[in-house]
A protein has these predicted regions:
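Acidic (Asp/Glu)-rich catalytic clusters
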Residues: 24-25, 65-74, 96, 100-107
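Hydrophobic transmembrane alpha-helix bundles
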Residues: 42, 69-77, 114-120
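Flexible, glycine-rich active-site loops centered on histidine and acidic residues
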Residues: 2-13, 84-120
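N-terminal beta1-alpha1-beta2 module of alpha/beta enzyme domains
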Residues: 1-71
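Loop-to-helix entry region of an early transmembrane alpha helix in multi-pass inner-membrane enzymes
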Residues: 79-82
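Hydrophobic residues within beta-strands of alpha/beta enzymes
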Residues: 31, 77, 107-109
Length: 120
């Protein structure tokens, strides 16, 4: 069994490198970075509650995971999830391949369309 953690990295959260080093020291296997490039207004999709501030402020997952790759040796890096329908296909493929290369093959590419109908 492997253990990982997912976080919305923001300018007010722990830094990606700090968290990743602490996770690696404690035996975690992976860190997952969320993605929300924007939150549409108005939102037609109902949520159980108001979205937290982190949804609006989350950093780019490829940037944060590159910081993680540079600070760690074995921790797997994952997008959880990359909203591929909101991204340019060629640029996203290049980002994913670059991160995998920089990390020494530790990148896990989690993809999806998201849950918020207005983002799709």
């Amino acid at each position: 069994m492997e253990f990982g953690a997912s976080i919305f990295f923001t300018d007010y959260s722990i830094t990606p490198a700090e968290l990743a080093v602490a996770m690696e020291e404690r035996g975690f296997d992976s860190v997952w970075a969320a993605e929300h490039s924007h939150i549409p207004v108005p939102r037609r999709t109902r949520a159980d509650s108001e979205l937290g501030k982190r949804y609006y402020d989350v950093m780019d997952p490829f940037v944060t995971l590159t910081a993680v790759a540079c600070a760690t040796k074995r921790l797997k890096l994952a997008t959880g999830i990359c909203l591929v329908i909101q991204r340019d296909t060629i640029q996203t493929a290049k980002l994913a391949a670059s991160l995998d290369q920089v990390s020494g093959g530790r990148f896990l590419f989690g993809i999806g369309g998201g849950w918020n109908q207005d983002e799709i």
